[in-house]
Amino acid sequence: TPLWSLMQDLMM
């Protein structure tokens, strides 16, 4: 599972 996806969602 791509963690960056979640991180970017939170950053955005």
From Swiss-Prot:
Enzyme class: hydrolase
GO biological process, one term: nucleotide metabolic process
GO MF, one example: adenosine deaminase activity
PTM section of the record: N-glycosylated.
Cofactor(s) this protein cannot do without: Zn(2+)
pH effects: Optimum pH is 6.5.
Physiological role: Catalyzes the hydrolytic deamination of adenosine and 2-deoxyadenosine. Plays an important role in purine metabolism and in adenosine homeostasis. Modulates signaling by extracellular adenosine, and so contributes indirectly to cellular signaling events.
Recorded family membership: Belongs to the metallo-dependent hydrolases superfamily. Adenosine and AMP deaminases family.
Complex and partners: Homodimer.
Protein name, entry field: Adenosine deaminase 2
Organism: Gallus gallus
